[in-house]
């Protein structure tokens, strides 16, 4: 079993099972091991005054197939090398293989969820749309991880630059 991640808000179906599978495991879609911070490390980086802030050491992601949910916490420091490493934490083939272990004759629900810097994205669909679901999950993960705090801060605090440019041109 995996360690519980403090502040984890990824939804699990009622009575859902949590599997670790380990890297290269026969069932898990993940190809990297769980990198959850230790309790001491988590306490050092967690801001108790802002309960909506995530641990800045990485992000949480999960794949769910029916009642079975696989979760990972991966370290991510915002560098290009780190981005390429975490983008390879699972592939379409590893997801298809893991999901096929739980498919029967009926369609089951499949869900991908990622939480990074207070933003949570969940994509879900049926097992018949798994290929499309994994493609959307890859795009969402890449876009979410490439948003840096500087980009978010500049858009919010400085207003929309295209509006300022338009005003300058019209004067």
Swiss-Prot record:
SUPFAM superfamilies: Tombusvirus P19 core protein, VP19. Residues 1-32 are annotated as: Disordered. Residues 1-15 have a biased composition (Basic and acidic residues). It comes from the Viruses. GO terms for cellular component: virion component. One of its GO terms (molecular function) is RNA binding. Keywords: Host-virus interaction, Inhibition of host innate immune response by virus, RNA-binding, Suppressor of RNA silencing, Viral immunoevasion. One of its GO terms (biological process) is symbiont-mediated suppression of host innate immune response. Viral suppressor of RNA silencing which binds specifically to silencing RNAs (siRNAs). Acts as a molecular caliper to specifically select siRNAs based on the length of the duplex region of the RNA. Belongs to the tombusvirus protein p19 family. Homodimer. This is RNA silencing suppressor p19. It comes from Tomato bushy stunt virus (strain B8) (TBSV).
